Regions:
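Active-site-proximal catalytic alpha-helix in oxidoreductases
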Residues: 150-178, 182-195, 223
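Helix-loop-beta segment of a Rossmann-like dinucleotide-binding subdomain
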Residues: 59, 103-118, 168-178, 226-234
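NAD(P)-dependent Rossmann-like dehydrogenase/reductase catalytic/cofactor-binding core
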Residues: 184-281
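Short, hinge-like loop/turn segments at secondary-structure boundaries
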Residues: 9-14, 83-84, 104-108, 161-163, ...
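Rossmann-like NAD(P)(H) cofactor-binding subdomain of soluble oxidoreductases
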Residues: 18-104
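Rossmann-fold dinucleotide-binding core
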Residues: 34, 70-156
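Glycine-rich phosphate-binding loop and adjoining beta1-alpha1-beta2 segment
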Residues: 1-19
Length: 281
């Protein structure tokens, strides 16, 4: 945080765009910054609830809270503490890696890369959402505020549930996973299961074949990207978000009577890996 405040941030947009930004105001305590109009959460899903509690000193009676974190269940964590009319959810399609303090490499997809919207519509969430959309757009990020965020949120959950555990288990980038017929088949099986669960819930989402065709294009846009779960499993040895991805799809599948055998198995494998980092050979 001190490095960013004093020297700014160096951004590399893969493969060869470079930017330097100054003027960041940073703090390690929400108690030091006053009451905010909006608070955006961009933690790991496993860290969100602690982050919500830690942010309490800067959250006033009109503050809008926005989770841009991948995975199912982030809305429930917000609603545990704040009313739906002040809460928004969303997600992005921008893979990132922090190479060093103040240095970030991103692997964005083409088109819209950030989507967000209200859990329950209110004039305040609409006003904040449209302002946030403008800030993103002015900064060069193609972002869209949407009244109905669920189709896009589920699309990202299914995509991450496909890419994250499969590539982590195979220890491959998304491009190398996609290029291998067996890896691609595993991606596709999760997508088909996730789409079936979403449709059973009444989510207006594209058909599985269309989803897979679109996913193949995105894998080839950023083939070198190593997703965060693969980083956690292979390099950092950290707890993963598996329970909010394939684990959550499996749970929803049981509720709605949709079989999810691939999601079930991937959840077990990643859970076993992260439970035994210190014993691996």
């Amino acid at each position: 945080m001190d490095k960013v405040a004093s020297d700014g941030m160096d951004f590399t947009i893969d493969p060869d765009q470079h930017f330097h930004l100054d003027g960041f105001k940073t703090s390690c305590s929400a108690a030091e910054i006053g009451i905010m109009d909006a608070v955006v959460f961009l933690t790991k899903a496993t860290q969100l609830e602690n982050a919500i509690r830690d942010a309490a000193p800067c959250i006033g009676p009109d503050t809008v809270l926005i989770s841009l974190i991948n995975g199912l269940g982030n809305d429930d964590k917000l609603l545990k503490y704040y009313p739906a009319t002040r809460c928004m959810i969303g997600s992005g399609s921008i893979g990132t890696a922090l190479n060093a303090p103040g240095k970030c490499t991103s692997y964005p997809n083409f088109g819209v890369v950030m989507n967000f919207g209200p859990i329950e519509y209110s004039k305040r969430t609409e006003r904040v959402g449209k302002a946030l959309e403008k800030y993103f757009q002015d900064g060069g990020c193609n972002a869209v505020y949407r009244d109905d965020i669920l189709p896009l949120l589920w699309w990202k959950i299914i995509k991450n549930s496909s890419h994250s555990p499969v590539s982590a288990i195979l220890r491959l980038s998304i491009g190398d996973t996609d290029a291998d017929p067996c890896g691609r088949e595993l991606y596709d099986r999760v997508i088909r299961e996730g789409v079936a669960v979403a449709k059973a819930k009444g989510i207006n989402i594209m058909d599985a074949d269309e989803f897979i065709a679109h996913d193949k294009e995105q894998c080839r846009e950023n083939p070198a990207y190593v997703n965060s779960m693969t980083q956690d499993v292979c390099w950092k040895k950290l707890p993963t978000e598996i329970d909010m991805l394939t684990g959550a799809l499996s749970e929803q599948g049981r509720i709605y009577g949709v079989p999810t055998p691939t999601c079930d198995l991937l959840t077990l494998i990643i859970s076993a890996i992260q439970n035994n980092y210190d014993k691996q050979i």
